[in-house]
């Protein structure tokens, strides 16, 4: 009887010790995961570092050299809601995802379309904006052309290296030649100069370029190609960051702030005198 009681006591003590160890391990792991989240890093640092590239009207320099546009507005609002400062880190598009993965900044907020191929490397929030691509053509070089005529070895497109339009052009117009540049402005300039027949970009960029250069450029088709959503991009294995950014986006979709801000930059022209 005494032996049995002693054995039961040993077994009970071992079980309790195991439970205590498991609880301690779980608590330690949870604390470790929380501490590793970029959200905790931002809070401790007091600054959120946002990677972006420059393209109108997502983000651009005004006459004083300051960043303005939809993305700076989103980034400033996000930082204010988190109670931290914001640091924008302009980065060329082709290297922006590698820079995020390398820890150069905390999140990409730069009109990045959510795609399965990008999702292999980074996680995306829910979309905070939606847009489509349109063709911007050199009027004289493409006069009388139908859409299918653009898929020809005699046609040259230009695009911003690493951006969604480059991939779309290669898939939609595989026979056409493709020139790649680091900025949308350089891509558009090739069309203006007559070195490329057309380029593609997200609206309202093409329509604005056509209005600024009515003698040379036009948007030949009233079609939004490859319409999709843009999300915040963040490093993998960070559920806290994903949860926070999603909740922030849902909140400001609900309040209407995101729509109002998007409409200001994409549907209006009150801001043009800041940059022209």
Language model features: what each stretch is:
Residues 5-9:
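N-terminal export leaders
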Residues 28-111, 120:
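Extracytoplasmic small-molecule ligand-binding "clamshell" domains
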Residues 28-33, 72-81, 141, 148, ...:
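Extended ligand-binding regions for polar small-molecule ligands
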Residues 36, 88-98, 143-145, 161, ...:
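Short helix-initiation/N-cap motifs at beta->coil->alpha
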Residues 49, 53-57, 67-80, 113, ...:
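Bilobed "Venus flytrap"/periplasmic-binding protein-like clamshell domains
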Residues 76, 80, 85-151, 217-218, ...:
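Acidic, polar ligand-binding/catalytic clefts
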Residues 95-98, 112-120, 168-171, 192-226:
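A ligand-binding cleft/hinge motif common to bilobed small-molecule-binding domains
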Residues 130-137, 203, 207-250, 268-276:
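Periplasmic-binding protein-like
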């Amino acid at each position: 009887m005494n032996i049995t009681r002693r054995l039961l006591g040993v077994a009970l003590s071992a079980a309790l010790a195991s439970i205590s160890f498991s609880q301690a391990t779980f608590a330690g792991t949870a604390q470790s995961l929380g501490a590793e989240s970029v959200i905790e890093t931002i809070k401790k640092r007091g600054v959120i570092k946002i990677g972006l590239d420059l393209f109108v009207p997502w983000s651009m320099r005004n006459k004083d050299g300051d960043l303005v546009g939809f993305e700076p507005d989103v980034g400033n609002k996000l930082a204010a809601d988190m109670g931290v400062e914001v640091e924008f880190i302009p980065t060329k598009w082709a290297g922006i995802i590698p820079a995020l993965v390398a820890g150069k900044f905390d999140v990409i907020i730069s009109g990045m379309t959510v795609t399965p191929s990008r999702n292999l490397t980074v996680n995306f929030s829910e979309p905070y904006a939606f847009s489509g691509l349109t063709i911007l053509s050199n009027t004289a070089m493409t006069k009388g052309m139908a859409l299918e005529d653009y898929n020809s070895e005699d046609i040259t497109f230009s695009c911003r290296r690493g951006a969604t339009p480059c991939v779309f052009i290669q898939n939609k117009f595989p026979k056409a030649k493709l020139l790649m540049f680091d900025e949308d402005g350089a891509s558009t300039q090739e069309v203006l100069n007559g070195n490329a027949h057309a380029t593609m970009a997200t609206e309202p960029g093409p329509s604005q370029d056509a209005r600024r250069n009515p003698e040379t450029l036009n948007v030949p088709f009233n079609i939004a190609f490859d319409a999709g959503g843009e999300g915040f991009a963040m490093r993998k294995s960070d559920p806290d960051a994903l949860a926070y950014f999603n909740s922030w986006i849902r909140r400001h979709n609900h309040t209407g702030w995101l729509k109002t801000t998007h409409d200001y930059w994409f549907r209006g022209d009150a801001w043009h005198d800041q940059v022209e």
